[in-house]
Amino acid sequence: MNRENVNKDTPLYPGMQPDLKVEVAIIGAGTSGLYTAFRLVTDNKYKGNEVQIFDMSDRLGGRLESVVMPGMNFWGELGGMRYLTSQEIVTTLIEGYPLKEQDLNKRTPVLKDKMTPIPFHMGEPEKLLMYIRKERFKQNAWTEEQKHDNKLITRYYLNEEDEGFSSDQLFNKIIYNVLMADSWVAETYKELIIADPNGYDYTFKLTSRDWDAIKPRLIYNFPGSPYDKRLVNDIGFWNLIKDQVSQEGYEFLANAGGYYSNTINWNSAEAFPYMVGDFSADTTYKTIEEGYDSIAYAVANAYMEHEGARIWSENKLITFTKDHHLPHTHKYELTLLNIQSNTTWKVYANSLVLGMPRKSLELLDQNNFFFDASKQEKLNENIRSIIMEPAFKILMGFERPWWRDLDIHSGHSITDLPMRQCYYFGTDDETKNSMLLGSYGDMETETFWKALSDDKVLFKVKAAKSASLEALHKLDDVQATQFMVNELMNQLRELHGDSVDIPEPYVTYFRDWTDDPYGAGYHAWKAGFSVKEVMPYMRKPLADEQIHIIGEAYSDQQGWVEGAFCEAEKMLQTHFKLDWPYWLDREYYLGW
């Protein structure tokens, strides 16, 4: 395992410097905040000491966190874990430019840290499991039946015309039918929205630009429906799915799709491109061999190379005001709490960039001039235009890759049990120690796991090959509860069946992203909000203030690092007048 390529010992400064004066104060050392600092100083807009980052955590990266478990020589992911090669900012920063050059060795790197892009293996559907309503299938069972002109009948009472469709196919069928029922869409994009003659498959060749043209004006044309003639943007996704394929069809999609978060009652117009994904030519999922949080460290290191650059860790923003004694030189006075000393101190800045999701914004002083609900009604409404989606992750270390007994090597299995899915992450070639991710990032299961994760008795680590108790005990405070491990093992055994003997884990690693200050693992737009208007609004909510809100939460790629990068880039170009990055393809579409 290479720990040399990416420097993850980026210096963090947990101290304080009362009355510090800066041009730009960035709150949040997640990907959007780090990217903003990197661009402002490398573009020579400001010097390093004029742009400072503050974060209440003792680490950087926000909701990216890669860890190595004792006895294993590879990284596991507690947060975001992959990117799509169609996401050009993140791909270029990781792989170099130009992206049109297929040979990665011939590309020019943007950042000094050398990240190694590797495929994010989705596994083989003919081996991976789907366990729903107490029936066990291989994930390709639907398409296998279709090859023989049969329909796979499950224990879901689907409408007759929907029987035999896999969950992916049924999602696509719904989206196809709604798009084609709008005569303008059907006429304008008929070459790009294709139904396969086999009756099950649909192909969408729509670009992000196409979707942005479609989303605000797509009409739901289904006479007799409660939602007939309404904008799809104003219909909840659950409402729409039930209307198209019945409540039982909805249950099938919610369970077999693997994520309840995809089928919550969020904005249908935003859900469509999210569900279809970017299937433009050669788009693949990748990750970084050095851990996916390497992208955060590499961007941070590029900023930190500049003299005076600093990331103030363990410093929490409490409030900010314009009413202070230095209004002639600095617009805002920030009050920060230094966590180690438990004392407050002041920072003065002319621009404020809040690289924060909804919950973090709500934890700031809601009575200051910016958030004051009686005066800033529109801002408060728009802050609440997104749904916070809970996400728990639990990594488990086993002394052998027991899933190989089922001929499974990578990918994930899906179930309607509260665990929802598990990813088979990797195996150390020497020790055979192996990692599994139990990921229940979901709305409906949150209370099930919360009752278990709140218990006081934590899992006790056990020594394993090349994993000393001393090394393992360092992870004592991040163990899942014994309750949770017991329940998860019970569900893993039910999901995989009697044909495999599943041993107990020797170590776990638990992260609940619902905890403050994140409040959620990712976010989703509510139905009825004009996303086209809210996105640019959030990047500068008040016309006469230099205060900007960025991050994945209010982006059109929620849950992706690219969403955070695109919002930061648009904010920088519009409000800081930065030029288009020299390393980014000029044709790349950044969205609204």
Predicted stretch roles:
Residues 1-24, 42-48, 591-592:
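Extreme N-terminal leader/targeting segments of oxidoreductases
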Residues 2-11, 406-592:
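Conserved flavin/dinucleotide-binding core of flavoenzymes
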Residues 28-32:
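Glycine-rich Rossmann-fold phosphate-binding loop(s) that bind the pyrophosphate
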Residues 41-70:
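Glycine-rich FAD pyrophosphate-binding loop
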Residues 72-118:
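Conserved FAD-binding subdomain of flavin-dependent enzymes
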Residues 106-262:
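Mobile amphipathic helical/loop "lid" adjacent to a hydrophobic cofactor/ligand pocket
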Residues 190, 194-319, 323-331, 335, ...:
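Active-site/ligand-binding neighborhood in enzyme catalytic cores
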Residues 313-447:
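Mid-domain catalytic core of redox enzymes
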